[in-house]
Amino acid sequence: MAKRMITTELMEEDVKLETSLRPQMLEDYIGQKKAKENLKVYIEAAKQRKESLDHVLFFGPPGLGKTTLAGIIANEMGVNLKTTAGPAIEKPGDMAAILNNLQEGDVLFIDEIHRLNRQVEELLYPAMEDYVIDIVIGKGATAKSIRLDLPRFTLVGATTRAGMLTAPLRDRFGVVHRLEFYTTEELKEIITRSAKVLQVEIDDCGATELARRSRGTPRLANRLLKRVRDFAQVKYDGRITEEVARFALDILEVDKLGLDHIDRQILVTMIEKFAGGPVGIDAIATTIGEDSGTVEEVYEPYLVQNGLILRTPRGRVVTQEAYLHCGLPYENKELS
C-alpha cells in the first residue's frame, strides 16, 4: 500500500517534526480536556504522596497524542522516560532487561502494547502489580527461578486496538483514557502554535482551512502545515492564508472533508458499481485493488465516522451525504 499524505500513522518525516512541536507540560497540551484534567489530579496526588503514578493506558486512533502524553507525564513527575514498542520486545529476557534498568519513579512507555507476545506480557503482570520479576536461570533439572525486586515505576501503554488487549493486562492499569478526535477549533489552536514554532506566518482563515481538512488528528494537521508552508513559500509570499491553504491542499488532493483520492474512489465505486450498496467489504476491496483488511482498518473508519458510509447487517451502504460530496445524483433507498 502506497503511503498517503493523510495517513494518521507515523511517517518517517513526522518524527523530527513531532519532536520539535511536542508540548512538554500539561498546561501546553491542547485538547483531550477530560484526560488532561484527570491526569493533572492524579499526578499532583502522586507527587504529594511521593509515590509513582499508577500505570496508565491510552487507547484510540493513531496520531492523537498518546506518545506526547507519556512524555508529559514523565516531565510533570520529574522522572526519566524510557520508550519502546510491543513488536520490539521479542523475548521475556528483553523485557526483563528493560525493567531492570529502570530507576525509581521512571516512566516506561510501551507503544503498540497490544502486540506484546504472551510470554513477555505475563512477565509484566508481577512487575506491574508487585514490582518484581521472576527469572528462570538454566535449563531442565538444573533450572531455578530467581526473583528480582524492581524500583517502583509507571507503565504507560498505548494502543490503537484496545479490543486486542487481554483482560489480565488491561485490568492492571489504574488509569485508562480513550483519546478522542480533535475539534476544528482545537486543531486550529494546534496549527497556530506549530506555525509559531516553525516561524511560519499564518492567518486565522488559513489555520481554519487547514484544521477542517486534518481529519481531527494533530499529527496530520502538523504534516499538512509543513507541506502548505512549502507552497506558501514558493508560489506565494510565504504567508499562509485561506487561499494558499485551499490551493495547496487541492493540489495535494485533500478535499474539504479531509478525504483523499482513495477515500473518494471507495465512495464512487460503491455508488457506480454497486448502486450505493449494500455491498460486502471483500467486493469493495477487490474492485479498488486493495485487500479487505486494509479497507476495513485504514479507510473505512473515517468514512463511517463522518457519516459517509453505514454498516448494516447486509453490508456497507453509502449515505446521501456521500452522494452529495461526490457530486452524484442520489436516489432514496430504504436501508435494511
UniProtKB/Swiss-Prot annotation:
GO biological process terms held by the UniProt record: DNA recombination; DNA repair
The keyword Chaperone is assigned to this record: no
SUPFAM superfamilies according to UniProt: P-loop containing nucleoside triphosphate hydrolases, Winged helix' DNA-binding domain
Chain positions recorded as Mg(2+) binding sites: T67
Keyword Amino-acid biosynthesis: no
Binding site for ATP: L21, R22, G63, K66, T67, T68, E129, D130, Y131, R172, Y182, R219
Reaction it catalyzes: ATP + H2O = ADP + phosphate + H(+)
InterPro entries, alphabetized: AAA+_ATPase, AAA_lid_4, DNA_helicase_Holl-junc_RuvB, P-loop_NTPase, RuvB-like_N, RuvB_C, WH-like_DNA-bd_sf, WH_DNA-bd_sf
EC number: 3.6.4.-
Cellular component GO terms, alphabetical: cytoplasm; Holliday junction resolvase complex
Sites where the protein binds DNA: R311, R316
Residues covered by region (Small ATPAse domain (RuvB-S)): 183-253
MF-aspect GO terms: ATP binding; ATP hydrolysis activity; four-way junction DNA binding; four-way junction helicase activity
Localisation: Cytoplasm
Renumbered residue ranges of the record's region Large ATPase domain (RuvB-L): 1-182
Region (Head domain (RuvB-H)) location: 256-336
NCBIfam families tied to this protein: PRK00080.1, ruvB
Subunit relationships: Homohexamer. Forms an RuvA(8)-RuvB(12)-Holliday junction (HJ) complex. HJ DNA is sandwiched between 2 RuvA tetramers; dsDNA enters through RuvA and exits via RuvB. An RuvB hexamer assembles on each DNA strand where it exits the tetramer. Each RuvB hexamer is contacted by two RuvA subunits (via domain III) on 2 adjacent RuvB subunits; this complex drives branch migration. In the full resolvosome a probable DNA-RuvA(4)-RuvB(12)-RuvC(2) complex forms which resolves the HJ.
Domain notes: Has 3 domains, the large (RuvB-L) and small ATPase (RuvB-S) domains and the C-terminal head (RuvB-H) domain. The head domain binds DNA, while the ATPase domains jointly bind ATP, ADP or are empty depending on the state of the subunit in the translocation cycle. During a single DNA translocation step the structure of each domain remains the same, but their relative positions change.
Family label: Belongs to the RuvB family.
Protein name in the entry: Holliday junction branch migration complex subunit RuvB
Source organism per UniProt: Lachnoclostridium phytofermentans (strain ATCC 700394 / DSM 18823 / ISDg)
Organism lineage: Bacteria, Bacillati, Bacillota, Clostridia, Lachnospirales
